[in-house]
Amino acid sequence: MAERSQHLQDVFLNTVRKQKISLTIFLVNGVKLTGIVTSFDSFCVLLRRDGHAQLVYKHAISTIMPGQPVQMFEGESPE
């Protein structure tokens, strides 16, 4: 189950990275971050906004909301 969850997470982050979709990321402490994912790995997400980069650790992330519908899989219609 953990492997499938990691795969879905990777597919989502890679899709928004490739399509340069703006995200709003809410942290567990309530802080709201916005920007575009430029890179990610198993532990962190690199977010860019206004030419500045922020390295956000995944364990601190509560929710990620894309600014537009995301089509993650072939043949899937964006919602």
From Swiss-Prot:
Gene3D superfamilies: 2.30.30.100. Residues 10-70 form the Sm domain. The keyword Iron does not apply. Pfam families: Hfq. GO terms for cellular component: cytosol. One of its GO terms (molecular function) is RNA binding. The keyword RNA-binding applies. One of its GO terms (biological process) is regulation of translation, ncRNA-mediated. Keywords: RNA-binding, Stress response. It comes from the Bacteria. Homohexamer. Belongs to the Hfq family. RNA chaperone that binds small regulatory RNA (sRNAs) and mRNAs to facilitate mRNA translational regulation in response to envelope stress, environmental stress and changes in metabolite concentrations. Also binds with high specificity to tRNAs. This is RNA-binding protein Hfq. It comes from Bartonella tribocorum (strain CIP 105476 / IBS 506). The gene is hfq.
